Amino acid sequence: MKFSELWLREWVNPAVDSETLSEQITMAGLEVDGVEPVAGAFHGVVVGEVVECGQHPNADKLRVTKVNVGGERLLDIVCGAPNCRQGLKVAVATVGAVLPGDFKIKAAKLRGEPSEGMLCSFSELGISDDHDGIIELPADAPIGTDIRDYLKLDDNAIEISVTPNRADCLGIIGVARDVAVLNQLALNEPTIEPVAATIQDTFPIQVEAPQACPRYLGRVVKGINVKAATPLWMREKLRRCGIRSIDPVVDVTNYVLLELGQPMHAFDLDRLNGSIIVRMAEEGETLTLLDGNEVKLNADTLVIADQQNALAMGGIFGGEHSGVNEETQNVLLECAYFNPLSITGRARRHGLHTDASHRYERGVDPALQHKAIERATRLLIDICGGEAGPVVDITSDADLPTRATITLRREKLDRLIGHVIADEQVSDILQRLGCNVVKTDAGWQATAPSWRFDMEIEEDLVEEVARIYGYNNIPNIPTQAPLIMTSHREASLALKRVKTLLVDHGYQEAITYSFVDPKIQGLIHPNEASLSLPSPISVEMSVMRLSLWSGLLSAAVYNQNRQQSRLRLFESGLRFVPDASADLGIRQDLMLSGVITGTRYEEHWDLARQAVDFYDLKGDLEAVLALTGKLSEVEFKAENNPALHPGQSAAIYLCGERIGFIGVIHPELERKLDLNGRTVVFELLWDKVADRVLPDANEISRFPANRRDIAVVVAENVPAGDILAECKKVGANQLVGVNLFDVYRGKGVAEGYKSLAISLTLQDTTRTLAEEEIAATVAECVAALKQRFQASLRD
């Protein structure tokens, strides 16, 4: 928000300079982004009157004038402005004046005629970019007065960043309140007297959506002159706030917007039909806006309509059909309180952002509307003339926001601030902020003012007290806290340790949004319901993720499109699964996921370029599972997953319970996501592996180990893992190692079969095993494999 420092000082005028005032505003939480003078550096410019104005004898576009600047004689000045005329009050730069850019005014001759000064435009004084003509001052401007004093140009335009919670500061009144409280001064509010109705004309108003519009005020003003000139003082205030003067009706509503923070709108009364109806739009209903653009409305958009058409998007933008124009004589002034939730997001949906929507989305004081409409009525009649009818007020008290009553405990205040502020000072701060305060035994009970939506809980009051007391006044004392040694379960496996392991394996941690694209999620998890957001950031971020794969695969595509072909990413985070049995109907599971793609190794002269495969990621995952001490209990079983390749994927089971998946992305999904090359992913339910098995110390045998190799032929569909598990079960007492070291298909092995070469390592802790014992164990393994899998020894 941008405003004039002098306008602010009309409301409250602390005895501090501009720099200190800006510092106060910043420390109050309204960060000052910039301070700049409202006019250029100049001197020697005064108010003058054009006494004579005639055509230059030697130039068609120049005029020769005689100007009274309050001196002993009239000044001869040559001027080329088309609006120069006799009787006009103007800004005159006399001989010796210095204009912005160090431009010095000297006596000269222009086309043979003497010129003893210059009649100035706004642009020549560094006030604005208006080059259309010289400045036209009011007829009562005192001749000879310094123009800087007359126009109050020794002023600054202050621009502040207003946080969403401080919508009350989107008007001069809100900033002035804070400055008054900080300096312990009274607020000099302008006297706003009710404008008596001089006619009894009203216009019917119906509110069909009271929850969206709890209060709607309308007032008929007839017989206005819309061609009247907006006073210079108002145009200047608007300009210094960054708003261009348009016509007196719009200027008045903009003035009230800036002064009180209350948006208003004026309808051309003669273009309205029947009555004003505040309702929700019909699906697909259209409206042509004031800027000429046509928008198609949704059913959740609030509109102001008459008996025939929608006239405006409520709280956002007016319509062209009912807008005020140069032919307007009668207007209906609108002043309303709209529920912020009924406005939020609607403007953005249509690519709009207006001063009105900016304020209504954040919240407007629901007690302000009567004051605002009286202020606008008085200003409009003073400028344009006309007669006002009575105010029509349609209010649904049940739908208006209630003022929060908050308990502030002395103990909580002292603990959070870390400093004791006297009771009397706390009460004074809260009262000056507009709260109704009652002192209690434990602290205070405060009722928030109507304009402060952000005062809801105890911590809000603590913040307000600290803010007004002054953060700089709170002594710097080191934080003191009792040292409590928390117990640490040795069996707990820190997620940080797993992340470190993955980083050591060449992975990088990714952090992706919990909000994902429903199209991508639908490809990965078809036919699975997900939680949709009622007000998403965008369509591409409108559902909560069912797994981390959506974000990781999108990140992989993003990086591949930027010439990063070799990727190793992992992420830990929550997934959100609809579950009727869970709290609030949603289950949140902490997941650990990873993705790899590209080559197995970084490019190197001594290494072949090989693409990653299933076993690369499986090896990394087994390293993670080894940290838990449960790797021996983990099984990888063939199981269908729509996102994974049916022949290169597996479900991960721990003690018979499925805890995740691993596999190559399905070729069809790879194509739809535009993934480049083979991509392998895994995902684990972290809570299922977060507790590790504590290692047991075992005796190391001092007797020799014996290795025997066997090659068994089994059907193609028999998992090698099942073969190894069966061997371990049979030789549990003396078999200390089972390993698959070769898989063969081809000559000598029938089609549909494969040969698995397995090494069996046997060892005892008490003695050297005899050859007969070794042979017996190997024979038992072969027999068990033959019985369960119809395996046979390969010749």
Swiss-Prot record:
Which residues are in the B5 domain? 401-476
Q: What class of enzyme is it?
A: ligase
User: Which positions are annotated as binding Mg(2+)?
Assistant: 454, 460, 463-464
Q: Domain (FDX-ACB): give its ranges.
A: 701-794
Residue ranges constituting the tRNA-binding domain according to the UniProt record:
39-148
* GO biological process per UniProt: phenylalanyl-tRNA aminoacylation
Question: How does the annotation summarize its subunit structure?
Answer: Tetramer of two alpha and two beta subunits.
Family, according to the entry, reads as follows: Belongs to the phenylalanyl-tRNA synthetase beta subunit family. Type 1 subfamily.
- This one is known as Phenylalanine--tRNA ligase beta subunit
The species is Pectobacterium atrosepticum (strain SCRI 1043 / ATCC BAA-672) (Erwinia carotovora subsp. atroseptica)
Q: Which gene encodes it?
A: pheT
